Amino acid sequence: YWTYNIVMDTPLKQKAEFRLGQIVSHSKFRYRGVIVDADPYFQGTEEWYENVAKSKPAKNKPWYHVLVHGQGNETYVAEGNLLSDENTDPIDHPFIEVFFNEYDNSGSYSLKQNFN
């Protein structure tokens, strides 16, 4: 992934720690999920950040869209709040088949198409 210098709008070589289709867990809330999209830096509103992101994670690092296991929702999570999930069980979410072709039994799904 590429991130951009917000002031100069120039590409920086900053690699995201997680990849699309990877199963992760939230370090604070302990839920599991799968990454369906990634932003090179926070792209939400300032209001959302102030009201929802209580721990005030870094805005200039990657943020991820995660389908939450066992629920029908998606979360927007800072890279610093995610961990690789050691549990390789598949994710149960109603939109899994919308984004992914198959699960490889090692903690990763293959994308149907490139959404990013």
Range-by-range predicted roles:
Residues F18, Y31, W48-Y49, Y64, ...:
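Aromatic side chains
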Residues S27, V36, H69:
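Structured beta-strand/turn binding interfaces of compact recognition modules in eukaryotic regulators
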Residues V36-D37, E46:
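Short, glycine/acidic-enriched capping/hinge loops at junctions between secondary-structure elements
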Residues P57-N116:
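Intrinsically disordered, low-complexity, charged/polar segments
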